Amino acid sequence: MRVLIAEHDYHVYTQLLRKAAPDLEVFSTGDSAELSRMASDCPVWLGQPDLMANLLRQGHTPQWLQSTWAGITPLLADSLSRDYRLTRAVGIFGQVMAEFVLTYMLGHEREVLARLMSQVERKWDNRTG
């Protein structure tokens, strides 16, 4: 089976997929024109929705499209074909998102950016906390 990887970090995904499933034919590149040429020969696509949306706009359609993002918004444009199976990354970003939100909330509560600006401007900051 031929698998196209449309991802900015395509080399990492290619290496991991070839190691996990050596019987697959994996196609990947950082060049968008070459990616477009490869797309028509690959029934399975793995990658970023924004990059795969460009391939769909060019008239290519996979049998199965696996998003590496949880969100699929770029693939929902009215002009794009939806004649394929679409799956997305789910259940793997929970802890990372929780850490991001907690860090952001702490930074907001402690006014980290305002304190940084005061330091850059060499102003004494009398904020409590």
Predicted regions and their residues:
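Phosphate-binding beta-alpha-beta segment of Rossmann-like dinucleotide-binding domains, i.e.
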Residues: 82-129
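An N-terminal-biased, well-structured beta-alpha scaffold segment characteristic
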Residues: 1-86
